[in-house]
Amino acid sequence: MSILDKKALKFLEDYLNNAAPTGYESGGQKIWMNYLKPYVDEFITDVYGTAVGVINPEAKYKVVIEGHSDEISWYVNYITDNGLIYVIRNGGSDHQIAPSKWV
């Protein structure tokens, strides 16, 4: 028996199939916020791709559900005649993980 209902599975499928590389997080934010909408009273977003749902925002103590929605991404910059792929990174991924790696 799954602990995820159909709505949760649909959210997970939509979220995982959505491209949200660094700088283009808004699609992921929208999916996350639509899923949380029935459970929170307000949302806060920032320019870094964070979406926060707040329960009972006027209370002294609040419940906050937070998610950061970008993913590591690299762009193909060039492909050689021998099939070597040259990539450039997008965002803050570690540049030392890519050189001479099999893809």
Region locations from a protein language model:
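N-terminal hydrophobic/helix-forming segments and targeting peptides
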Residues: 1-103
